[in-house]
UniProtKB/Swiss-Prot annotation:
Location(s) in or outside the cell: Nucleus
Disulphide linkage map: none
Basic and acidic residues composition bias: residue spans: 251-264
Basic residues compositional bias, start-end: 268-277
The protein, known as: B3 domain-containing protein At3g19184
Species of provenance: Arabidopsis thaliana (Mouse-ear cress)
Length: 277
């Protein structure tokens, strides 16, 4: 046992010596000393001074004014008595007032159209012409007048142009012709209003130049152009009106008698009630 322990100790010592030699060969001792010196120097060195903290500027969250004018006084939220609001009167539009529109009867419309065709037949056939009966959408109720398609294809320009409308008094007006839509647009409504066109009127357009229409207006309510047949009818109507007046007078007298009898009965009934009381 003693010999074994000595041999083990001897082996350990031999190993330690070998390790020291190797460390010497590798200069590990010097490296360890240099590390110790560096660590001691770093611990003994003075710490670097801390950088001074800069003061932060407080942020202003108020609204930035970009106007050069002086700022007005702050708003006041005090409660004051409110004055009653005045309602503005509504502006009545003649164009939208459908109740005031007057529509021509079929007989009057056909009568005006027949007179317009007679006038058209008397015009110079060298220049093209057509007759157009007026509707509400053609006059005050709208701003557009469609022209006959065959007439437009045969005689009207192929592009948009400004047409001149010359009335019977040689007064000129301007209206824009739209080639793709075959009608008059800008300026037609003003012409219709200025010449007081209404539903049922018949208008004759005579193309006296490439961009000029001579316009003849036949009024639906023009009594001066009525024929003699109309006068005879009026005479017959006058006789019938006299008979109607006589009948009305008799009926009025009967109504007066019945009213007077009713008043007498009421007065007698009131007297009886007073006597009972």
């Amino acid at each position: 046992m003693v010999e074994s322990e000595l041999s083990y100790e001897q082996i350990r010592l031999n190993r330690v010596e070998e390790n020291k030699k190797r460390m010497g060969e590798l200069n590990l001792n010097k490296l360890a000393q240099s590390l110790r010196v560096s660590s001691s120097s770093s611990s003994s060195s003075k710490p670097s001074p801390a950088k001074p903290r800069t003061m932060r500027i407080p942020v202003d969250f108020s609204e930035v004014r970009r106007s050069s004018r002086a700022k007005g006084p702050p708003p006041s939220y005090k409660e004051f008595g409110l004055e009653p609001l005045e309602r503005r009167p509504r502006r009545s539009s003649r164009r939208r007032d459908l109740l005031n529109r007057v529509y021509a009867s079929d007989d009057a419309r056909m009568y005006a159209f027949d007179r317009a065709e007679k006038l058209q037949s008397s015009l110079d056939s060298e220049y093209a012409s057509f007759t157009k009966p007026m509707l509400q959408s053609h006059v005050t109720g709208g701003f557009w007048l469609g022209l006959p398609l065959p007439f437009c294809k045969a005689h009207m320009p192929k592009r948009d142009v400004i047409m001149t409308l010359v009335d019977e008094e040689e007064e000129e007006s301007q209206a824009k012709y739209l080639a793709q839509k075959n009608g008059l647009s800008g300026g037609w409504r003003g012409f219709a209003i200025d010449h007081q066109l209404v539903d049922g009127d018949a208008v004759v357009f005579h193309l006296i130049a490439r961009t000029t229409f001579k316009v003849y207006i036949i009024r639906v309510n023009d009594d001066a152009n009525n024929d003699s047949d109309g006068n005879e009818v009026n005479d017959d109507d006058s006789d019938g009106n006299e008979e109607d007046r006589d009948n009305d007078n008799e009926s009025n007298e009967k109504q007066k008698e019945t009213v007077s009898e009713g008043r007498q009965l009421r007065s007698s009934g009131k007297r009886k009630r007073r006597g009972r009381k």
